[in-house]
């Protein structure tokens, strides 16, 4: 795997057998002069270190060539950023150094790397800039995680790809021992980080589906997961700075290379480290991601069966008339599709190279028969994952903007449906909620609303014959009084998802959950336009907080159905029962 340490070999090395294990490094290096290069391909180099051009081959006619098979293969898939071999080495009948040459394949690979750099750098920079410029995206958990994933992809673009290109051009390492350790550490770090952030995204979506109303806890949990992703990536990449170092060729003192040569005393040790890297970067994240989305699919399936058994919901005496497939559910599904697509792209890009890596680890002889150009292509496909993510984001954003534009009036004013989409996007996690929040207590009489400033309004709860209603005591524009009459026919138009039809001022009005109206018979008992509205949810434990941006007709006792309440936030109020 490209996170494996690998061994960028300076020359064809003999197999590490007992007769070599006790020799000094110089003796082992010199022993290569007696081994023959059996193919025109270069000795392979390791993924973690860069292109094949870093290797210098030695050729001789005095050996059967069996000795170079181990290291030529080891430099291939276990760590090579560019595959087993792409440099042509001319066969020689005399013992000596054969300098690598830049073939058409090498030039083509460099060109592809440059194209990938342009796409990855431009696309991910656009994603980061867009997210930082949008206030609502800065408040979103999903957007925050996508931003971290874009940062990891930018590190691939600005660290890994230039390192690959430069190494292929210069062949040897010119930057010194400190740079060798730092760059190889950073190269592994950004790749670990990318897979770890995908795990965070999947777990966040899993918790969002299972606990849709625990918004405050979800934001804190998301930040903790992202911090853990960075820490784990850092810890996993530390060995790279230990095992890699600059070494000089014993027979060509001016030739230096950043290698792990001589660090692993046996092939088993190197294989174990390479296997650890494959598991930590690919298989372990993939297992967690698969488990998370399995839970999500099971939860969605269970909810679908519940909807089939009941077209309407009942809680106590409150009858809720809602759409079967609600806008908030659609918003969550859009977010879920986005995250699943990102994971599928990751698996699609990396799986072929991982399979080839494992193939080499357990059957080197047959793996070495694979054409070097194919191996180069497999790794380029893996690196292209950093280019694919911005394309996924862009495609998703375009699909979301088309219906939004259709819902705009000719004069540019947002229609109620468009406002509703913004509200449901907030609940789905794609748009951040406002700063207002409710602090839940075990005692429902002690629920406190903390507004945008220092104001704290105590929310009193009282029960009626067929429902629970809320009374919010405050002054000025924040004043809302809602009361109902039990047997007199009072109804509360609230639900967790979708639109609700209510009777307001003698007429039927269909509004999304961002609005609330209480009626007694055919008239509104008491309703004043407020800056903040609270909606009692069907589970009698949670409230919905809406922050309206304007009211078109703020008359005291009439609810205007054209009101735009802006973004909506779901809140879990704790231990109500």
UniProtKB/Swiss-Prot annotation:
Record bears the keyword Translocase: no
Topology Cytoplasmic: residue spans: 130-141, 203-223, 297-341
Comp. bias intervals (Polar residues): 412-421
Topological category with respect to the lipid bilayer: Multi-pass membrane protein
Membrane spanning stretches: 109-129, 142-162, 182-202, 224-244, 276-296, 342-362, 378-398
Disulfides per UniProt: 180-258
Alphabetical list of Gene3D superfamilies matching this protein: Rhodopsin 7-helix transmembrane proteins
An MF annotation (GO) of this entry: G protein-coupled receptor activity
Role, per record: G-protein coupled receptor specific for adipokinetic hormone/corazonin-related peptide (ACP) (EC(50)=10.25 nM). Is not activated by the closely related peptides AKH and CRZ, or other tested peptides.
PANTHER family noted in UniProt: G-PROTEIN COUPLED RECEPTORS FAMILY 1 PROFILE DOMAIN-CONTAINING PROTEIN (PTHR45695:SF22), LEUCOKININ RECEPTOR-RELATED (PTHR45695)
Protein name per the record: Adipokinetic hormone/corazonin-related peptide receptor variant I
Organism encoding this protein: Aedes aegypti
Classification lineage: Eukaryota, Metazoa, Ecdysozoa, Arthropoda, Hexapoda
